[in-house]
Amino acid sequence: MQENKMGTMPIDKLIISMSLPIMISMLVQALYNIVDSIFVSRINEYALRAVSLAFPIQSLMIAVAVGTAVGINAFLSRTLGEKDFEKANIIARNGIFIAIASYIGFAVIGALISRPFFSSQTEVMEVREYGVTYLTICCVAGMGIFLQTTFERLLQATGKTIYTMITQSTGAIINIILDPILIFGYFGMPRMGIAGAAVATVFGQIVAASMALWFNLKFNKELDISMKGFHPNGHLIGQIYKVGAPSIVVQAIGSLMTYGMNLILAAFGSAQTVFGIYFKLQSFVFMPVFGLNNGMVPIIAYNYGAEHKDRVIRTIKHSVAYGVGIMCVGLIVMHIFPAQLMRMFDAEESLIAIGVPALETISLSFVFAGFCIVVGSVFQALGNGVYSMIVSVARQMCVLLPVAKLLSLSGEVTLIWWAFPIAELASLLLSTYFLVRIYKKIICHIGEPVTTREITE
């Protein structure tokens, strides 16, 4: 049985076997994000800026999809560790129901608020029109992202991460192939411009979701996801969101931060475009760490449910080391090749002049971020996702945006980028405090009788 692997395989080998396929697939996705923006930049800078300004809503969609899936994954892995397989099936079905409901909500939102959303961020009419076209398509036809994420987490929860790699990579590769064809009208296709970029995105997501569903039906024998006779279970949905909601808030706060930064940077013209380019580039660094987390969460959750304290502790230590190591590589690359990275997006010298100090300064926060990202997922795996939420709110809303706004008053855009390292340092301190707290309250008591835990706490 797959659960035995998560309870017995050597930790290093287990983390790699669980995480590497997801990391590879997320790297492919990150490559898609970069390639997609490179193709869009060939239309003009206004189109690239529009895609950058659309990011907060797209990020919010991903926040709801991934955050819900995090709750499903952690709850499901813990239930499988407890050997309650019937309950695991019910959890999986309720997760699928939530994914469909989430899509319907965003389809309505995309149809109604796209124009006022862009009007609030820019006065440039060309940027607005590009943005409305792009975002409306991504929202109204965005069911794929919700179902893809849910079906992939069902595979991850039972240790079948290789199929997740296949689905994510296939979806991203389809995106990459279709982007130039639909944007520029190759091979007899109509020239769709920025609408082509949106269509390529949603089509790739739908294909990936379909593949993930097929893999679950064909190979995921631990779970029965048939919806025949299904009725929503409010209690289980509540348990999913007990872990998932803080994760949603954590990522949604990121969307709000991006929107706030776009408003702050609006006074500096092309700085909005630079900020968008940075986010595309940083995804290539952050995505492998997120992939590491996706492999780590079910390992910790399973061994927590199975009361294997030593394996929980070693998984945390090794994951932190891997996460920080990955971020150090990203820091080095952005300090050695900042101008070359900007030129990939057809950037003119004026844009490069803003972009180089931005990449060099913001990337200083990467090392701290590696620790904080991994530790945040540890909180979620142990059913304490609220700690991740507190850290995220404090970092982005209480530190980053206020500091960025304060520094913007100087009129020097290069100073604004320092808000990121400052905020990440605050996040490091708070994350460390919560990690010590959760170790004393939960981790060190794993395997003890319940009465002993209660007395200690």
Residue positions per predicted region:
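Structural signal for membrane-spanning alpha-helices in multi-pass inner-membrane proteins
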Residues: 110, 153, 179, 183, ...
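Transmembrane helical elements of multi-pass membrane transporters/channels
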Residues: 17-36, 137, 148, 171, ...
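Hydrophobic transmembrane alpha-helices of multi-pass small-molecule transporters
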Residues: 60-63, 175-180, 209-213, 284-287, ...
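Short alpha-helical transmembrane segments in multi-pass integral membrane proteins
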Residues: 1-19, 76-143, 191-245, 300-365, ...
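Helix-terminus/linker motif at the lipid-water interface of multi-pass membrane proteins
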Residues: 27, 31-49, 118-125, 181-192, ...
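N-terminal transmembrane alpha-helices
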Residues: 6-38, 42-43, 59-71, 75, ...
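Short runs within selected transmembrane alpha-helices of multi-pass transporters and secretion channels
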Residues: 69, 73, 138-156, 164-172, ...
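Small-residue-rich hydrophobic transmembrane alpha-helices
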Residues: 48-111, 145-164, 274-332, 336-338, ...
